[in-house]
Amino acid sequence: MSEKIVQLNEEVIKGQIKELVRGSVEETLNELLEKEAESLTQAARYERSEARQGYRSGHYDRNLTTTSGDVTLHVPRLKGVSFETAIIERYRRRERSVEEALIEMYLAGVSVRRVEDITEALWGSKVSPATISELNKKAYVHIEDWRNRPLQGGKYPYVYVDGIYLRRNWGGEYENVAVLVAIAVNEDGFREVLGAAEGMKEDKASWVSFFQWLRGRGLDGVKLIVGDKCMGMLEAVGEVFPDAKYQRCTVHFYRNVFSVVPKSKVKIVAKMLKAIHAQESKKASREKAKTVVSELRAMKLKEAAKKVEDGIEETLTYCDFPSEHWTRIRTNNVIERLNREIRRRTRVVGIFPDGNSALMLVCARLRHVAGTQWGCKKYMNMKHLEAALDDASIAG
């Protein structure tokens, strides 16, 4: 006897299961809404009760996108009592996270078509181009509001600056664009992202414009600016913050010296350089630097010796400040860590569609980090600086 062969249409079955799950989710959510309404009114529908706190007045429909697909919620209308449902609030939070993801995708240069495909794969329904366009407008408004917010941290004694280079499309050609970033430690000892702006290139004009923009928003009380050596930035510091001192990042200084040192000798030279900044006073560091210069010349590393001799003084400015702060103010590490996170995010984009989208994504990431423990955890005890402000070398 021949056996009967049953053929199953896998796609049909998947579709039926998906619809079954979606329907179950919709039914469950609506039942929960009814239970919430009963709890608020302290009575079931049509129930006569002296304990009743409010009355029903029909329903209104609310569409929600869930991981199981689109569902329609029949939200009870109530009279005499406010109905703030926890069900919808939970989905509002989920919707916000979805919105943030869509915004980040768009800012990263993902095409509208690709965003549609991704949303369909994740949530079972496409986000329309009109919705993406609205999210884009909303993103730019929110980020611009944050970027131009007044700085309300009081005084900012320590400011760290750097430039991040990203690739963008300009009239069909690809070029580098600099995004200038500044963070600070405020008078209470907390780190704060001051802002970011497109600088085109790290020249004096870009830095002057950047610093003036920060001052206009409330940057005040700057005692020290830490950053890599950039002549445009140094000239801008002297013009916009004449009372502030400059500290060249020691890590960047080391790298500059290593650029003229054979790989086989980098480790020994690194130990020699670190020994300079391990001294307990500026005078001792200067003496150690002279010794290192002589040793480098003896090792036939004349170019390295010249770089140390010419550049060491601007790496010792931190010695004019409280010793308790030295390890935190002689390098740009506090901003470098942020930059690594930004580069990790922007690397997947490769080339941005324009400079503004690059700036917006950098700002979106900075705003996110600022809202985490990074910005809520005390970074320095500023009482040490307060006690030292009587010293004319700092107070200026």
Please provide the spans of the model-predicted regions.
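Metal-dependent DNA phosphodiester-chemistry modules and their immediately adjacent helices/loops
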Residues: 84, 257-291
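Acidic/histidine-rich catalytic cores and adjacent linkers
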Residues: 2-4, 35-38, 42, 107, ...
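Short, amphipathic alpha-helical "recognition" segments used to contact nucleic acids or chromatin
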Residues: 97-109
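DNA-recognition alpha helix
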Residues: 113-124
